[in-house]
From Swiss-Prot:
Its main location: cytoplasm. This is UvrABC system protein C. Gene3D superfamilies: 5' to 3' exonuclease, C-terminal subdomain (1.10.150.20), GIY-YIG endonuclease (3.40.1440.10), UvrC, RNAse H endonuclease domain (3.30.420.340). It comes from Borreliella afzelii (strain PKo). Residues 17-94 form the GIY-YIG domain. SUPFAM superfamilies: GIY-YIG endonuclease, RuvA domain 2-like.
């Protein structure tokens, strides 16, 4: 590794000092990370000279080559970086995971508006109140508002009255005409409560509460007391900023050990309407992270760009990011940083929201892992899970992937890809493939005295599971690590101790953890197999007269250049339906490639 870094560093010090983008690649020419720089040489040198975080150390351990693209300006570099990241989706760059966020109350923009809970803002002139952290209390208040003020619940118009009309909870706007004035009066009362004007309604509740106690109707008294408490609490939640009436987003980055939390507090007309939590596992520094986030987040198709975007980081050049967002979205937003008393209060709120979001994210995974431990009959929590999948194209270029999840979160530094050697040309045998990859992985762990995972997940059914278990048994570690498989058809979980299999309900947190591991392993294996095939296809297009379609046909029908070698020109011609002259060129190419690589 040191030798590789030394030779890389020698190349780095010869790089230009102009602006541009750089790509860090592994031994298979897979792009691991894409970055941009005002000074390419200086920026890339920093990876070798500075004190590095654990993630960057792991990245540099896997980097075998660095490619650069120079640009005329820093802005061009930013634009290029944005396009390259979207195209290649490197593992070590920012990949956003949406947090659910707290609910808000939406009043629709309709002739007879409806009032309901939502987690999504739609730009259709609807009014929004919130967000509300206590969902239970919000539900109580909404139930009270809908019952008290006869707000419409039905979406469509009808010729007959609805159930709510018969219960006295609706004016009947779904089937009656000309109720606009009466309905608006009811709606204004509901809005008044959501705007925090609750003193009058609290007085009415107090009167009803006293009457209920006098009549010894304690059940109703408890309900009224709960409604009063809920009204007071949600009134306190409505936070209004006095800075201005513009639409402003406040973006805060909260770095964590494995996951970074990015909070966006959205103010519309001076009122907080939404908290959006995003989670990121990239290796980016704080400054790089916020710039990449701003570009990805605000250039996405459905995102509404506010008048101003306030970031809580000093001394960051955001001009290019601002320009790019405005060009792509045709807006006039400003990215700013200010320090005022009001903004510092918003920052405190952003920090507490970030900490809360991270706790929720981690707690969600902890509960799922606890549940998984019980279903899989494990002694310990499956803190470390290693997942395996196999990929091939009709028996060609069979590869395997191994992904690692720590506490339910992808731990990409530990991912591995394997070119499998035990299968014959054209042989499709997932059982044999699983045996090879499990043997290679856990022999390495034993030989290097590395930490075993708590759980191994195999993509497949009983056959693949038994194959993996037989290897673990041969290595004498079958009692040190739990192994299970997940079959795609019915999402059945198989254990060596349970012949029937376990079927959890769709959406169950424990099943979702296993699905995430399985899907990630599947994505990595397929991606690796695709890259291997593309590499071979590209090689064949160097033959005079061979286009991409014929190159793909050679790969599909014959395989690699090694598979071409034993074939005659007639056999090549027959297999891929080309003339003898072209078959001759293909044969000559295979002989030449073999001589170069032996």
């Amino acid at each position: 590794m040191k030798e590789n870094l030394t030779s890389l560093f020698e190349k780095v010090i010869k790089l230009p000092t102009t602006s541009g983008c750089y790509k860090m690649l592994n031994e298979n020419k897979k792009i691991l990370y894409i970055g941009k720089a005002k000074n390419l040489r200086s920026r890339i040198k920093s990876y070798f000279l500075e004190k590095k975080s654990h993630k960057i150390k792991i990245l540099m351990k896997n980097v075998k080559s660095i490619e650069v693209i120079t640009t005329n300006s820093e802005y061009e570099a930013l634009l290029l970086e944005c396009n390259l990241i979207k195209t290649h989706k490197p593992d070590y760059n920012v990949k956003l995971k949406d947090g659910k966020g707290y609910p808000m109350v939406r009043i629709t923009h309709e002739k007879y508006p409806r009032i309901f809970k939502t987690r999504k803002i739609i730009n259709d002139q609807s009014e929004y109140f919130g967000p509300f952290t206590n969902v239970k209390k919000l539900d109580q208040v909404l139930d009270f508002i809908n019952k008290t003020f006869k707000i419409r619940k039905c979406k469509k118009k009808s010729n007959t009255p609805c159930l709510y009309y018969h219960m006295g909870q609706c004016l009947g706007v779904c089937f009656k005409e000309n109720l606009e004035k009466e309905y608006q009066e009811e709606l204004d009362k509901a809005k008044s409560i959501l705007n925090g004007n609750i003193s009058e309604i609290l007085s009415q509740i107090d009167i009803k509460l006293k009457l209920a106690v006098q009549k010894e109707d304690f059940e109703n008294a408890i309900k009224l007391k709960e409604i009063k408490s809920s009204l007071i609490e949600i009134n306190q939640i409505q936070i209004v900023t006095k800075t201005n009436n513009l639409n402003t987003d406040y973006v805060y980055v909260h770095p964590g050990e494995n996951v970074n939390t990015i909070i966006v507090l959205k103010y519309r007309n001076g009122k907080l309407v939404e908290r959006d939590a995003n989670f990121d596992e990239s290796i980016c520094k704080k400054n790089e992270l916020i710039l990449q986030f701003l570009i990805q987040y605000y250039t996405s198709i459905n995102m509404i760009v506010p008048d101003k975007i306030h970031i809580f980081l000093k001394d960051i050049d955001t001009k290019n990011a601002e320009k790019l967002i405005n060009e792509i979205k045709n807006t006039k937003t400003e990215i700013i940083y200010k320090e005022t008393e009001e903004i510092l209060k918003i920052m405190e709120m952003a920090i507490s929201n970030a900490e809360l979001s991270l706790r929720e994210y981690e707690n969600k995974n902890n509960k799922a892992l606890e549940s998984l431990k019980i279903f899989l009959e494990m002694d310990k929590l499956p803190k470390i899970i290693e997942g395996f999948d196999i990929a091939h194209l009709k028996g060609q270029e069979t590869v395997a992937s191994m992904v690692t999840f720590k506490m339910g979160i992808p731990f990409k530094e530990n991912y591995k890809l394997y070119k499998l050697n035990s299968l014959l040309k054209g042989e499709i045998d997932d059982v044999k493939a699983i045996k090879e990859v499990i043997l290679r992985r856990y022999s390495e762990i034993i030989n290097k005295n590395l930490e075993l995972p708590n759980l191994i997940l195999i993509d497949g059914g009983k056959g693949q599971l038994n194959a993996a278990f037989s290897i673990l048994k041969g290595l004498k570690i079958e009692n040190k690590v739990k192994v299970c498989s997940l079959a795609k058809k019915h999402e059945t979980i198989f254990l060596t101790t349970n012949k029937k299999g376990i079927n959890l309900p769709q959406g169950h947190p424990a099943l979702r953890i296993l699905q995430n591991v399985r899907d990630e392993a599947h994505r990595k294996a397929n991606g690796f197999n695709k890259k291997r095939r593309e590499k071979i296809t590209l090689l064949y297009t160097k033959i005079n007269g061979i286009g991409e379609k014929t190159a793909q046909k050679i790969l599909k029908s014959i395989g690699t250049y090694k598979d071409i070698l034993p074939l005659s020109e007639n056999e090549i011609s027959e297999k891929i339906k080309v003339n003898i002259r072209l078959a001759k060129r293909i044969k000559e190419f295979a002989i030449k490639e073999n001589s170069i690589k032996t």
